[in-house]
UniProtKB/Swiss-Prot annotation:
Keywords: Ribonucleoprotein, Ribosomal protein, RNA-binding, rRNA-binding. Part of the 30S ribosomal subunit. Forms a tight heterodimer with protein bS6. Binds as a heterodimer with protein bS6 to the central domain of the 16S rRNA, where it helps stabilize the platform of the 30S subunit. The keyword Flavoprotein does not apply. One of its GO terms (molecular function) is small ribosomal subunit rRNA binding. This is Small ribosomal subunit protein bS18. The keyword RNA-binding applies. One of its GO terms (biological process) is translation. Belongs to the bacterial ribosomal protein bS18 family.
Amino acid sequence: MYKDRDTNQRDSRFENQQDGFKKNSNFRFFKRKSCKFCDSGKHPDYKDFDFLKKFITEQGKILPKRITGTSAKHQRRLALEIKRARYMALLPFVKK
């Protein structure tokens, strides 16, 4: 069945590949975002609503940590403080 194929032709397809993996030129290395709270020593506070606005979308949703770059500990605290600020009417629940 495979006797008709030329082995040199089959091997020439893999000449430009290393270890059978094709190099992906579209892959980019991204610098890991650092937590603003860990770097500065500052903690999220519901009274600082101008600073909390940076972590909210235009619709009023809380941005995820993969976008903001905050650590898991500070992301949980940030969400809690945003919810407190909403309850105290310092931040809107929904923006229109």
